[in-house]
A protein has these predicted regions:
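Intrinsically disordered, low-complexity, positively biased terminal segments
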Residues: 1-17, 84, 162-411
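Helix-loop element at the rim of GNAT/NAT acetyltransferase active sites that forms part
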Residues: 27, 34-47, 186-198, 267
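Conserved beta-strand in the GNAT
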Residues: 63, 69-78, 93, 98, ...
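Conserved acetyl-CoA-binding loop-helix of GNAT-fold acetyltransferases
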Residues: 94-118, 253-264
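Conserved active-site alpha-helix within GNAT-family acetyltransferase domains
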Residues: 121-150, 279-295
Length: 411
């Protein structure tokens, strides 16, 4: 793996609750699997676990123990996150976080997170998906992407006359076109804030298409365009009338339109569903946008800045900006006062003693980073304080993005 090094830490930490926190050992993995299956209600196969373990740096898993018993688990993966403008940051992807129901509210999660974040010194940023939205803000994580669940009643769907029909889509067996799928996915993620590099072992797992990953659906079908692809499954009773798009990656607008034309042209199917970013183009393609229904909206990727200046300097910006940020960070103490200067899309950020224009915490900064949320919204909610409306408008303009943020894949 590209980043195998982590900070050296003590082997065991003990807290007042009598739980101990230490590095996970090989013998702990069966117990870790039991704890996570109990927490999430899903058993992962040994083959699937091996794939995710191949993405872990050394010493990146910790366990909480009550005596000899493992009662909690947490780890992080070595991921590559695309940020606005196309730069890529190494990201510690926190995963497999679970505590036994017998040991709730005894400090297991806090103890594991203390231990886990000590090991992230090689990373400027960390990310996770939150099973419960109220948990992770206190650790400095903020929701940075949004999933919108769309359903289309396809029988009445008609495309506007102005919408082109690019063509070029084929129905293929995905394993026979792996190289092309990998290339398209890499092009897509390089332009998409929130995109993640998919390593070879994870592609092996995707194409293995194990029954445990199907959520009751059929094996994957694949639509392939020179600049995009869509994976989908069929769900329902014997007739399988619901199409569930599990991944749509388009490197061009033409490819996205071409794929939607085929998906909405699947005869004998009633509903096409997809999880996508807010503002998806689909409604604008159809003569009757009411056929596209939003059935759910929820957070996707949560981000936590570990090196604030480095992370803010990594992305590009949509407008010039000169602002002093006062960032609080109660969990790790990595906040402070920072001068952020943006000229021609590029930023310089450094600690300063100047008076602050904006006061907020590191979780809000994480939510703003990929452009999915506006500073003015947090100001309205009193989670960001700024007494100058022009500065607030400048923040909104600078952090805005042309390409909507979208999490590359779940981890």
């Amino acid at each position: 793996m590209r980043r195998a090094g982590c900070a050296t830490v003590e082997a065991v930490h003990t807290d007042p609750t009598s739980l101990t926190f230490r590095s996970a050992e090989e013998a702990d993995w069966p117990a870790m699997a039991l704890i996570t299956a109990t927490g999430f209600g899903v058993w992962r196969s040994e083959e699937t676990v091996a794939v995710w373990r191949s993405m872990m740096p050394a010493d990146s898993a910790v366990v909480a123990c009550d005596g000899d018993d493992v009662v909690g688990t947490a780890l992080f993966l070595d991921l590559e996150l695309t940020v606005p403008g196309g730069a890529v940051l190494p990201m510690a992807g926190v995963s497999m976080v679970a505590v036994a129901p017998t040991h709730r509210r005894r400090g297991a999660l806090s103890g594991m997170f203390d231990e886990l974040h000590r090991r992230m010194n090689a990373y400027p940023i960390a990310g996770l998906e939150a099973s419960e939205a109220e948990i992770y803000g206190r650790f400095g994580y903020g929701a940075a992407t949004v999933w919108e669940r769309l359903e289309v009643h396809r029988r009445g769907a008609r495309f506007h006359l102005a919408v082109p029909d690019p063509g070029g889509v084929r129905i293929v067996r995905p394993a026979e076109h792996r190289a092309q799928l990998e290339d398209i996915d890499e092009r897509w993620r390089r332009r998409t804030p929130g995109g993640l590099h998919t390593p070879a072992r994870l592609w092996d797992e995707i194409l293995a298409d194990r029954e445990g990953s199907r959520n009751g659906g059929t094996p994957h079908y694949c639509l392939l365009h020179p600049d995009g692809f869509a994976f989908y499954r069929l769900h329902g009773s014997d007739e399988k009338t619901t199409v569930e798009v599990t991944k749509l990656a388009a490197a061009t607008a033409e490819a996205e339109i071409a794929l939607w034309r085929v998906l909405l042209g699947l005869d004998l199917k009633e509903i096409v569903g997809v999880h996508t970013h807010p503002g998806n183009v689909l409604r604008y393609l159809l003569t009757d946008p009411r056929l596209v229904r939003t059935t759910n909206v929820e957070d996707g990727l949560w981000l936590r800045m570990l090196d604030i200046p480095a992370v803010l300097q990594a992305r590009t910006y949509s407008a010039d900006l000169s602002v002093v940020l006062e960032i609080s960070d109660e969990f790790l103490g990595r906040g402070g006062r920072f001068a952020l200067q943006v000229r021609d899309g590029h930023a310089h950020c450094a600690p300063t003693t100047a008076d602050a224009d904006v006061h907020t915490d590191v979780s809000v900064l994480g939510s703003l980073y990929l452009g999915a949320h506006r500073a003015s919204s947090f100001a309205t909610a009193h989670r960001l304080r700024c007494n100058d409306s022009q500065v607030l408008a400048a923040l909104d303009a600078a952090f805005a993005v042309d390409v909507p943020a979208e999490l590359g894949y779940g981890f």
